[in-house]
Amino acid sequence: MFRCRWTPYLHADSCHGLQRLLGGEYNFNRTEASIWKRFWLPASWGKIDCSVKAGAEWNVVPFPLLILPEANLSYITQRETFSLINNMEFLNDRYASMSLSYDMNGKLFNRIPLIKNLKWREMFRIRALWGTLTDKNNPFKSSNPDLFRFPTRDGKFTSFVMDPKVPYIEGSIGIYNIFKLLHVEYVHRFTYRDNPGINKNGIRFMVLMVF
């Protein structure tokens, strides 16, 4: 049985833009919602943080106004962001994302005598993104002159339409409480590994103080 000590956090917002209002060139209408919940596991097996988000852009807009994944291009890890997605790699007008973070709170390391004295803690993460681009916003399927062609570099596209049946997935294994301050994790990309110019693996850091 999970022990749910924390009430879920719910958030929803709607963002609108009007053409010719304060210099706006396009109408856009975006709706997003998210929920976050923490689950405590029995027998001191740690906790799981779960976050789910979903959103839609309802209007016809050029690609800079489409929904871009929360890509983190730095070496500093940030919660609920994607460490190995390039900026503007996927362009969606409908999306859903999920982030799971499992903090074992030293359950494994405490069984290893030498490691136990260091008081390191282990953490596992999985992040996934589902997305699609409707035909009205797809410049390859629409003749609307207001839509921009996707960006390119050296003659190759750098932005792509996701397969709605194939989510983007990345996972990581991390150690925190190093010197009571440092968090280090290894990140691996599981899907869309053939996209040009991507990193399939990486090392990320974070300053994380645990009390």
Across the structure, where does each feature detected by a protein language model lie?
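Exposed, low-structure sequence patches enriched in small/polar residues
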Residues: 1-211
